Amino acid sequence: MPNYGDPKYWEDRYKNSKGSFDWLEDYQSLKPTILKLNLSKEANILNLGCGNSPFCEDMYEDGFHNISNIDISNNAIEIMKNRNEKRKEMTFEVMDVRNLKFNNLTFDLAVDKSTIDALLCGNSSYLNVAKMLKEVQRVLKGNFLL
């Protein structure tokens, strides 16, 4: 079984990755829930563990442009930067969800489609999930979508 809790697994996965992959749900299936939050199109959105998913691109095309995408994998971030160089408002950064480099109360919405699951597969899983949730709570001023 893959070690989803190991950052090296993700680096290797995206090194050899072709195309894109959406964990669990795509944007279209979550769109009704997101729209019920009544966020403005100018909302600041944090996409945790973006991988190479088209989720942020679909959200961008729906009018949400202020999306900060993070992932622990440099390879994933490079893929996404290359794919989205024309979407200037979106940012892509290598970052650990347990140590977010954002100011307090920065985001209106945080989206996590499976990063928490990956942390639960690693060593010190409950401690790592607690660190992630504490960091997300710190940077979030609005709603949270798991």
Predicted segment positions?
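Class I SAM-dependent methyltransferase SAM/SAH-binding core
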Residues: 46-99
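A short glycine-rich, Lys/Arg-flanked "PGG" loop and its adjoining helix->strand segment in the class I
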Residues: 126-142
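A short SAM/SAH-binding and catalytic strip from SAM-dependent methyltransferases
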Residues: 108-126
